[in-house]
Amino acid sequence: MDPGTLLDKLESGDQELVQKALAEYNQENSQCFFFNAEQREERKKLGELVIKFLNRDLQPSCQMACLETIRILSRDKHALSPFTGRSAIQTLAQYAGLDYSEEMEMPSIPDGESAVEALKGLCNIIYNSVEAQEVAKELRLVCGLARRLKLYNETRSSHESKFFDLRLLFLLTALSVDMRKQLAQELRGVSLLTDALESTLALKWSDIYEVVTDRLAPPLGKEETERVMEILKTLFNITFDISRREVDEEDAALYRHLAAILRHCLLRQCDGEDRTEEFHGHTVNLLVNLPLMCLDVLLTPKVEQGSVEYMGMNMDTVEVLIQFLDRRLDRGHKLRETLTPVLNLLTESSRVHRETRKFLRAKVLPPLRDVKNRPEVGNTLRNKLVRLMTHVDTDVKHCAAEFLFVLCKENVSRFVKYTGYGNAAGLLAARGLLAGGRGEGRYSEDEDTDTEEYREAKPNINPVTGRVEEKQPNPMDGMTEEQKEYEAMKLVNMFDKLSREQIIQPMGVTSDGRLEPLDEAAQKMLQRQESSDLESDSD
C-alpha cells in the first residue's frame, strides 16, 4: 500500500479502517530497512498521524498496529522528526511503561506485545537521533529502566520485555555521557546490573567469591545469553574509567563479586562456537575495566578434578583466556577491537600475579629450541605475537610487544632472544632501552633456562633476525685498499644525499638508551668541546 492511500485512511479516524490499513502496510514493509528518498515527506506525515492516533483511546489491536508502524518508520534516520520531540518520546515511554516521576512508588511492569513494540521503536529512535537522546535524558528514562530492573526477580516478565529493556539501557548509556554517569553514580548501576547478571545466570555460591560451576551443565540458553550480553555491554559502559581511580573497600568488594561472576561466564559455553566467542568477548572487555586488585578472585577457586593447575593455583580462567587469544589471533579480523582487550588483560594480570605470568610464559615463551627460523615464522603463539610487533596498527603492535616484554620480566636481553632485535626495536626505543637493561617493573630474579639446542647455536644467532643465518661471503674479499675506500666513500655520499633530501634521518643511541638525531648529537658534542676549551683557556 502506498503512503498516500494510507494517509487518507488514517485521516478518516476510523479505528477499524486504520488498523487494517496499518496491518497491511506493516506486513508489506516488515523486512524493509532501506527507504527511498522520494516518499520521505509522506513517511514523515504518516509518522505524525500515527503518533497522534496513539494518544486516543484505542483498541489493543489498533495500538499494536500503530506501534509496529512506528518501529518500521523509525528505521529511516532521515525521517525521524515526528518521533524525536518530547511529546512523541513521552507517548512511547508510556506505552513501554517507562514514564518516570519521583512520586511513583512502583514502576509499571508491562508485559504485553504493545510494550515490547514501544521499546523496539524507542531503541531505533534513540540510536538514530541525538535530539531523542536529549529528550530521553530530560524524561529520565534511565531511572524508569533502573526501577524496573530491580523488580525482575519478583515479576514474570517475558524474555522480549526484559531484553529490550536492557537493549534500551545499553543504548542510552552508550550514547550519552550524562545518562552513563546517572546510572553509574546516582542509581548505583554496577550493583543493580550485577544483581541482574547473577539472577539471569541463576548462580549458586560455594564461597564468598566462588561460584559453583558445573562442568557437565548444558550450554547457556539462547535467551539467557542474549540478556547476559546486554548486561555485560551496559556494565562496560559504566565502568570504563574505574580502573584509573581509587576504589574504597565497599566498591572493591562489589568489583570482586562481579569478577567472580565473570570468571563463571568465561567457563560457560553457549549454543554454538560463534555465540560462545561473542559471549566471552564481552566478558573479557568488562574484565579489562575492573581494578587489577580485584582480579585475584580469578585464581582463588580451589583446584578440583579436571582443573588446570599450576604452582598449586587454579588456572582454568587463564587457560580459557589464552585459548581465546589464540583463536582471535587466527581470525585476524579487526585486531584492534578484538585482540587488544584480551592482550591488555593478560599483560596487566601478568604484572601483578607471579603465578599467572609464569603460567603464561610456559605457554607463550617455552624454552627456545627453534633457532633456524625467524621468531615471526611459524604457528606457535610466540610466532603469531611476534608478527604483530610490526603490525601497521600502532595499538596492536604496542599491545603485543608489551605482553611479550612483561612475560620476559622486562629484561631486554631475554626479550631480544625471543623476538629478535629487529622486532623488538620499536618497544625498546619507546622505553629508552635500546642500550639494554631492564624496564621499570619489579620481578623475581629467577634465571632464564636455555635449552641445549639454544646454547649450541647461540654464538651463531643473528641478534637482529633472531635466528642462525647462513654464512655469507664477505663482499670485500679480493678488493684492494683503494677499492674498499672508494666503496666506503660512495656509501657515505649516498647516506649524505638521502639525509640532506630528508628521505632518512640518521639516528644514534644516547647514553640513556633513547634515539637522537646524529646532527643534534654532533652539535652537543661540539658545544661540550667548546666549553671545555674555554675552561682550559681560563686556566
Curated annotation (Swiss-Prot):
One Pfam family it belongs to: Ric8
Keyword set includes Zinc: no
Subcellular location: Cytoplasm, Cell cortex; Cytoplasm
InterPro entries named in the record: ARM-like, ARM-type_fold, Chaperone_Ric-8_A/B, Gua_nucleotide_exch_fac_Ric8
Transmembrane spans: none
SUPFAM superfamilies noted in UniProt: ARM repeat
Gene Ontology biological-process annotations: G protein-coupled receptor signaling pathway
GO cellular component annotations of the record: cell cortex; cytoplasm; plasma membrane
Keyword annotations from UniProtKB, A to Z: Chaperone, Cytoplasm, Guanine-nucleotide releasing factor
Gene Ontology molecular function: G-protein alpha-subunit binding; guanyl-nucleotide exchange factor activity; protein folding chaperone
Family note: Belongs to the synembryn family.
Task performed by this protein: Chaperone that specifically binds and folds nascent G alpha proteins prior to G protein heterotrimer formation, promoting their stability and activity: folds GNAI1, GNAO1, GNA13 and GNAQ. Does not fold G(s) G-alpha proteins GNAS nor GNAL. Also acts as a guanine nucleotide exchange factor (GEF) for G alpha proteins by stimulating exchange of bound GDP for free GTP.
Name of the protein in its database record: Chaperone Ric-8A
Annotated organism of origin: Xenopus tropicalis
